[in-house]
C-alpha cells in the first residue's frame, strides 16, 4: 500500500501534490506529542491565547488571496465562494472568540436554596487535554481552523483529521497554524494534522488519548465513529447532513430574497451542510418564483476560479454524479418537472473537471427519493405548499433536522414556522445568519447531536467541574444526631427527616407543625 496520497484539482484535474498517509504508529506519536505540548499550554492565560488569535487573524487577512486560492485549487470552488465560506466565517469566529471566549470559560456562580444557604457553588471549565476533529472536505480552511480556534482557546491540544479529498489544503492550513505558534514561542505540536484511510481512522477514534471528538460528515460514517469512540466512552459532537428547507410565504422583497436563496442553494456548488436543499413556496408565489429562478439559474456560468466570467465552480468529486442523475430521473418519473440542468457537464475548457449543471427541479413532493436524501449538489428543488400548515408538513417530513430559513412579511406567520420547525437552527428573513452570529451550531433528529460554536461549543470541549464550598467559616455541614450513624431510632429518624422536608419544601401554612415534628424527633 502506498504511504502517500496523490491530490488533484477537481476544477481541471491537474496534479496538486502528495500528502503523507498516516499509519497507526504515526497516530500514536502525534497524540503523544500533542499531550506533551498541552501540559504547558493549559497553563497559559486568556490574554496569551488572545494574542495568538490576533496573530492568526492578521495572518489570514494578510494572506487571504493565497489561502483562498489554495481552497479553490483543492475543492474546485470559486474565489467568491472561498471568501464567504472560508475566509469571512473564520475571521468572524476569531473575532467572536476574542470578544467572548474568556467570558464563556470563566467560572460561573450557581444559585443556592434555603437548605443550602450557607453554601456557595460555581462551575469551572477546565481543558480536556487532546481532542480530535474529523472534518469534511467542503470548507477545508474553515473546517480545520474553526476547531483549532476553539480547542486552543479552551486550553486543549487538537488532532485534525481532514478528508482525503482535501488533504493537500488541510495540511497547508494546519502547517500555517503550527508555524505561527512556534514563532510566538509556543509548541507547534499543539496542532497535529493527520491524513489516513478509513482502516486506520478507527485507531484514532478509539484511542484512549483522545478526550473528545467532533465529527463533521455523513450519517453512515458517523455511526462508525460513534461505535469506535464508544470503546473508550469518548464524548462526541456529531454535525451530520441536512435537508434544509427554505420557506417562501409571499412576494415581499422577492428579488432581494431570491438573491439570498440563490446563494443558499449554489454556494460552493451546493456542497454546504446548511445549504438550501428544499425551496417550499406557498401557492400565491409559486409560479413567479419558478420563473425568476429559471431566469437566474439558466444564465449561470461554470468554470475555474481563475476566470473572470464564472458563477459556480466544480464539485469536489464526480463519484456521486450517477446517483444525482438517478435521483433527478426518479423524481421526473414521479411527476416532477426538470426545468433546467439535471446532469453532469463536460466543460469544453476543463474536460477533466468535475462539473454538474446548476439544476432547477420543480413540483417536488416528499414521496420522491430526492426529497428525502441530502443531495449536497447544485440542485434547486422546489415544492408547492397549499397552506402554511402544508409547508410545515413538507419541511418536517424528512429524517433530517439541521437548519432552516423562513422568509415573509407576516411576523406572526414567520414565528409559527420558527416555533414548529424540527431543526436545530432557524434564520428568519435570511440564510445561515445563525452561523455568523456564532450561535450553537448543530441539529436534531438524524442531523446529529451536540453543538459547536458559541458558549455551548467552547464549554462542550471542557470538563465542567462543579465546586461547592462554605460561604461562612463558622458554619459547616453537620449530621443531626437523629440520623447520625449508628442511628438511635429509625422511626424517629424518619419522622425527623419528614419534618425537615415539610419545613423546607412544604406550604407555609404547614410550617408550624413541620417545625414541631422536626424538633420533637431531633
UniProtKB/Swiss-Prot annotation:
Its EC number is 1.2.1.-. The keyword Cytoplasm applies. GO terms for cellular component: cytoplasm; cytosol; nucleus. Gene3D superfamilies: Aldehyde Dehydrogenase, Chain A, domain 1, Aldehyde Dehydrogenase, Chain A, domain 2. The record marks 138 as: Transition state stabilizer. The active site is at 239 (proton acceptor), 273 (nucleophile). Transmembrane segments: none annotated. InterPro entries: Ald_DH/histidinol_DH, Ald_DH_C, Ald_DH_CS_CYS, Ald_DH_CS_GLU, Ald_DH_N, Aldehyde_DH_dom. It is found in: Cytoplasm; Nucleus. This is Putative aldehyde dehydrogenase-like protein C21C3. Keywords: Cytoplasm, Nucleus, Oxidoreductase. It holds the Pfam family Aldedh. It is an enzyme of class 1 (oxidoreductase). Its main location: cytoplasm. Belongs to the aldehyde dehydrogenase family. One of its GO terms (molecular function) is aldehyde dehydrogenase (NAD+) activity. The lineage of its organism: Eukaryota, Fungi, Dikarya, Ascomycota, Taphrinomycotina.
Amino acid at each position: 500500500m502506498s504511504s502517500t496520497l496523490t491530490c488533484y484539482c477537481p476544477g481541471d484535474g491537474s496534479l496538486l501534490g502528495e500528502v503523507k498517509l498516516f499509519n497507526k504508529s504515526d497516530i500514536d506519536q502525534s497524540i503523544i506529542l500533542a499531550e506533551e505540548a498541552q501540559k504547558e499550554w493549559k497553563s497559559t492565560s486568556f490574554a496569551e491565547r488572545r494574542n495568538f488569535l490576533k496573530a492568526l487573524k492578521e495572518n489570514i487577512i494578510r494572506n487571504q488571496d493565497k489561502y483562498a486560492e489554495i481552497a479553490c485549487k483543492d475543492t474546485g470552488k470559486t474565489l467568491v465562494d472561498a471568501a464567504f465560506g472560508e475566509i469571512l466565517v473564520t475571521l468572524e469566529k476569531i473575532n467572536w472568540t476574542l470578544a467572548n471566549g474568556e467570558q464563556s470559560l470563566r467560572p460561573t456562580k450557581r444559585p443556592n436554596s434555603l437548605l443550602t444557604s450557607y453554601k456557595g457553588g460555581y462551575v469551572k471549565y477546565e481543558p480536556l487535554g487532546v481532542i480530535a476533529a474529523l472534518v469534511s472536505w467542503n470548507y477545508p480552511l474553515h473546517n480545520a481552523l474553526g476547531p483549532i480556534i476553539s480547542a486552543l482557546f479552551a486550553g486543549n491540544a487538537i488532532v485534525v483529521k481532514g478528508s482525503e479529498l482535501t488533504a493537500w489544503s488541510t495540511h497547508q492550513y494546519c502547517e500555517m497554524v503550527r508555524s505561527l505558534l512556534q514563532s510566538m514561542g509556543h509548541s507547534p505540536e499543539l496542532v497535529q494534522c493527520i491524513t489516513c484511510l478509513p482502516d486506520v481512522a478507527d485507531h484514532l477514534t478509539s484511542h484512549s488519548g483522545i478526550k473528545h471528538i467532533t465529527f463533521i460528515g455523513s450519517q453512515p460514517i458517523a455511526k462508525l465513529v460513534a461505535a469506535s469512540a464508544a470503546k473508550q466512552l469518548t464524548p462526541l459532537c456529531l454535525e451530520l447532513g441536512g435537508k434544509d428547507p427554505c420557506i417562501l410565504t409571499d412576494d415581499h422583497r422577492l428579488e432581494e430574497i431570491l438573491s439570498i436563496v440563490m446563494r443558499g442553494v449554489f454556494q460552493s456548488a451546493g456542497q454546504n451542510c446548511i445549504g438550501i436543499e428544499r425551496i417550499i413556496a406557498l401557492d400565491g408565489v409559486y409560479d413567479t418564483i419558478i420563473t425568476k429562478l429559471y431566469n437566474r439559474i439558466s444564465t449561470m456560468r461554470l468554470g475555474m476560479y481563475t476566470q473572470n466570467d464564472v458563477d459556480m465552480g466544480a464539485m469536489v468529486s464526480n463519484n456521486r454524479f450517477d446517483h444525482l442523475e438517478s435521483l433527478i430521473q426518479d423524481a421526473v418519473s414521479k411527476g416532477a418537472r426538470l426545468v433546467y440542468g439535471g446532469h453532469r457537464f463536460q466543460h469544453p475548457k476543463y474536460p477533466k473537471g468535475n462539473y454538474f449543471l446548476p439544476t432547477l427541479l420543480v413540483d417536488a413532493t416528499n414521496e420522491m427519493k430526492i426529497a428525502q436524501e441530502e443531495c449536497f449538489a447544485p440542485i434547486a428543488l422546489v415544492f408547492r405548499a397549499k397552506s402554511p400548515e402544508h409547508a410545515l408538513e413538507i419541511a418536517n417530513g424528512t429524517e433530517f433536522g439541521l437548519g432552516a430559513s423562513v422568509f415573509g412579511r407576516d411576523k406572526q406567520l414567520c414565528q409559527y414556522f420558527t416555533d414548529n420547525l424540527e431543526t436545530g437552527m432557524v434564520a428568519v428573513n435570511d440564510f445561515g445568519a445563525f452561523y455568523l452570529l456564532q450561535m450553537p451550531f448543530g441539529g436534531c433528529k438524524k442531523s446529529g447531536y451536540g453543538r459547536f460554536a458559541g458558549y455551548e461549543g467552547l464549554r462542550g470541549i471542557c470538563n465542567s467541574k462543579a465546586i461547592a464550598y462554605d460561604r461562612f467559616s463558622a458554619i459547616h455541614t453537620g449530621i443531626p444526631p437523629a440520623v447520625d450513624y449508628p442511628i438511635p431510632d429509625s422511626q424517629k429518624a424518619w419522622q425527623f427527616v419528614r419534618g425537615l422536608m415539610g419545613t423546607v419544601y412544604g406550604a407555609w401554612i404547614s410550617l408550624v407543625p413541620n417545625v414541631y415534628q422536626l424538633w420533637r424527633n431531633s
